[in-house]
Amino acid sequence: MRADSGAQGSAAQDIMINPLDSYNIRVVTPTSCDKYPGRYTSPYSAHRKHHARNVARKLGASSGLIFLSGQPTINLRDSDQSRPFRQRRYFYYLSGVDEPDCSLTYDIEQDLLSLYVPDFDLHRAIWMGPTLSREDAQDRYDVDHVRYHASLKYELQAWLDERKQGSELYLIHDSEKPEHLPKDLPLNLEQLRPAMDTARGVKDEYEIRMIRQANKVSGLAHRRILESIQSMSNESQIEGSFLNTCISHGARNQAYQIIAASGPNAAVLHYDRNNETLNKKPLVCLDAGAEWNCYASDVTRTFPLTGEWPSDYVRDIYKLVERMQDECIRLIRKGTRYLSLHNLAHDIAIEGLLALGVFKNGTIHELRQSGVSKVFFPHGLGHHVGLEVHDVSERSIMAIQRSDELQYRPILNSTCLPPCTLSAPLLEEGMVVTVEPGLYFSPLAMANARHQPYARYIDFDVAEKYVHIGGVRIEDDILVTATGYENLTTAPKGEEMLAIIRGSA
């Protein structure tokens, strides 16, 4: 049942919208739930509408209206089946609503956060179950007002009629502009996204709790695979086991495609075919992380199938990557430039590969400046984690002096993500970042390296002896705290990991 767009005025508005209330189907559950911090409840009452207010502060605006659309229901092309639903993260950040076809407004001056839910549709309710009602939404989400979608255009018009001179409508994308707006309405499409990116870079207590829970479930799933890996014969079984554990513990969604790469497949950074035999493979690199209430975890473990290192080659590369991670994590604290940790990881990799004979003919400084270490460590040390597995954050063009750029440029590439970039600000308390060093022996990368100026630093005969390994990566999610750091990742690694595989833990 939809409102007739021909009616006008507040009286007509009430007539059209209020009857929708009579169709509510309300489900009452006996369990309590945390309300998402659109505004905080006790004991955080001093931080009401924390996220919305924080974004307004980053905007530097005392008035204006923020409008955000959630993910609409969309069918697959040439099909009557809908696409798997995934909520838009900017919308979720201000609302906590993980339901399709919703939208919100935040009136900065009035400090009013309003949620708009789908109009009741009897046919849809019969076939798919009821959509979110106003009462359920008001109970579940900590917003000031809940309205049906039919009232949105009237609410927007009311704001337009009363808005102050200079007040703007803030949008992320021009394509999300609400219908029925005057063509001459001043839209601000430039400031909202940077403001929200900056706000999202530092997590509050609720967000940290969600990321910690996502890591807890991921840790259980990784542990279950270690316990049963000796009975598995194909990468697909690893993927299936991980999904089964996550779903059975309440985490239906993965933060990203599972990477279950055995042997040489582990040299492909985002390998996700997950369909090859494990037979005679020295290692499995499992990069998999569950999502909890839209918040991601990002966890990688690399392990031998028997719980014993099959050769010195395999053990030496694992131990080198383990050292890279341990030394970088130990230095995380607020005020640290993350890029310096990336630099340290490359220095440790270069030192280790020199000792193993993969590198030759140069000092650590010479090899770093040549860029040769990117052949075997081609990605950034880490990135932010939050509502996205590669989460957003502030970008400050003043973060690094031009004179310091030369020492970092050779070991950076276009795939490096904040905070592992020249423009990233220093680490702050509340940031969650990954530390994920890796060493890979990709035949393609090594073939290309033969034609580069830094080829003289590589002993290709020695490097070829490691190709069967594929690659080793170890990745944890690290919270920056007031006094240092907390490792949120609970998946076993190192000697504990090996003992679990052997059944001796």
Curated annotation (Swiss-Prot):
It catalyses: Release of any N-terminal amino acid, including proline, that is linked to proline, even from a dipeptide or tripeptide. The keyword Protein biosynthesis does not apply. The keyword Hydrolase applies. One of its GO terms (biological process) is proteolysis. Its cofactor is Mn(2+). InterPro entries: Aminopep_P_N, Creatin/AminoP/Spt16_N, Creatinase/aminopeptidase-like, Pept_M24, Peptidase_M24B_aminopep-P_CS, X-Pro_dipept-like. Belongs to the peptidase M24B family. This is Probable Xaa-Pro aminopeptidase Pc16g13390. It comes from Penicillium rubens (strain ATCC 28089 / DSM 1075 / NRRL 1951 / Wisconsin 54-1255) (Penicillium chrysogenum).
